[in-house]
């Protein structure tokens, strides 16, 4: 395969509803879309969701990364071996711009798979997808009326696992948690780095109705010792999201391994291959895994996350995303790749998953 063109552009798709949490609020996608074209006329598509508060990237900086490396990639990447070699040579640059590399990697993998007539899983040396994937209901930090409307839809659809974005305001958050407790569903909280220190976090968290399954990122990213203290005080696992964007971040985490759950999102990890590597490192260390999603992902990133979830095996405790046109005014493929009844995405219901490359755009 020879790459003849690599192009990057912003992807702007309106949301069907506004989504908010402690770090941001948005009403449309903020994504990078990369298209590669081979000399044989085969195209590949890639997507990522650069976020300043996750990896320090923006759509503009990610597009600039593509521009800086376009010519070298076209000249040197022709197959899986050369793609892996390029990534190894540029590891430090990718560490600093993982979302930018994610969109590039996915587009190249898509083109490689389409050229060879094989699926993403075959390219990665992974088993074919099978069975079903179970997704979580994710509820943003809206007012109580907005929460009630969202939860009513999720509950009617049969969801039994919920991730709730919290505000840090007990009057705002406690009624939501009470409603979820009454429903008997499993609940985890996402604080999006809300509190400045463990004492402030615990003052709020110890006043909440219990139990909760897990707590995501209550403090500044990378505050592992303080996070371990919060986990011990609450007897609740901590979900690492912004604190874990590559394998190195999992080394020497303090305390018992079951105190940590790693949220693996393809975009922030730097693509599907790096995401699988993080999953394998987490499993080897005894940590559990959530395969997460950035708000506003299209079906392409949903597709890319499936082999990552499959690689997690019994360590997988939850999945996020696959909202398709429930959140997006339109998706990149029709029908979109999204969960169905009960939050399940059944592989057999989506024949395009067996198509060459990513098979969705």
Describe the function of each predicted region:
Residues 1-56, 330-333:
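Structured beta-strand/loop patches that form or line metal/cofactor-binding pockets in enzymes
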Residues 4-6, 11-15, 294-361:
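Flexible C-terminal active-site loop/helix
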Residues 5, 161, 214, 261, ...:
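Residues at the N-termini of beta-strands
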Residues 37-39, 43-115:
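Metal- or metallocofactor-binding catalytic centers and their adjacent structured scaffolds
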Residues 114, 118, 139-156, 170-174:
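Active-site beta->alpha loop and helix N-cap motifs at the rims of alpha/beta catalytic domains
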Residues 116-141:
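N-terminal small/glycine-rich loop or linker at the start of catalytic domains
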Residues 132-146, 166-167, 192, 196:
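Active-site mouth loops of central-metabolism enzymes
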Residues 164, 170-304, 308, 328-332:
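Catalytic core of soluble alpha/beta enzymes
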């Amino acid at each position: 395969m020879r790459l003849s063109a690599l192009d990057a552009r912003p992807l702007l798709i309106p949301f069907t509803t506004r989504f908010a949490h402690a770090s941001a609020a948005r009403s449309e996608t903020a994504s990078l879309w990369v298209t590669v074209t081979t000399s044989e006329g085969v195209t590949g598509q890639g997507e990522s969701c650069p976020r300043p508060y996750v990896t320090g990237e923006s759509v503009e900086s990610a597009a600039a990364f593509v521009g800086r490396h376009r010519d070298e990639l076209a000249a040197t990447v022709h197959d899986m071996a050369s793609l892996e070699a390029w990534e190894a040579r540029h590891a430090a640059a990718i560490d600093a711009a993982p979302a930018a590399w994610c969109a590039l990697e996915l587009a190249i993998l898509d083109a490689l798979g389409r050229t060879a007539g094989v699926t993403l899983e075959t390219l990665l040396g992974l088993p074919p997808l099978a069975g079903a994937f179970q997704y979580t209901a994710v509820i943003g930090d809206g007012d109580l009326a907005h929460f009630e409307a969202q939860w009513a839809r999720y509950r009617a659809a049969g969801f039994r696992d919920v991730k709730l974005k919290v505000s840090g305001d007990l009057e705002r958050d406690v009624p939501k948690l009470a409603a979820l407790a009454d429903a008997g569903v499993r609940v985890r909280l996402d604080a999006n780095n809300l509190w400045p220190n463990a004492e402030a976090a615990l003052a709020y968290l110890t006043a909440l109705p219990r139990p909760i399954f897990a707590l995501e990122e209550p403090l500044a990213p990378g505050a592992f010792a303080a996070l371990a203290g919060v986990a011990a005080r609450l007897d609740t696992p901590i979900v690492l999201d912004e604190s874990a964007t590559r394998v190195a971040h999992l080394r020497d985490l303090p305390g018992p391994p079951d105190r940590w759950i790693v949220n693996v999102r393809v975009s922030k990890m730097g693509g599907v291959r790096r995401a699988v590597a993080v999953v394998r490192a987490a499993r080897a260390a005894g940590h559990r895994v959530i395969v997460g999603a950035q708000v506003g992902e299209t079906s392409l990133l949903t597709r890319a996350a499936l082999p990552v979830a499959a690689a997690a095996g019994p360590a997988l405790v939850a999945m996020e995303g696959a909202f398709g046109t429930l959140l997006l005014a339109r998706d990149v493929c029709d029908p979109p790749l999204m969960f169905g009844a009960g939050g399940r995405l059944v592989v057999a219901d989506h024949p395009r998953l067996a198509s060459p490359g990513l098979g969705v755009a």
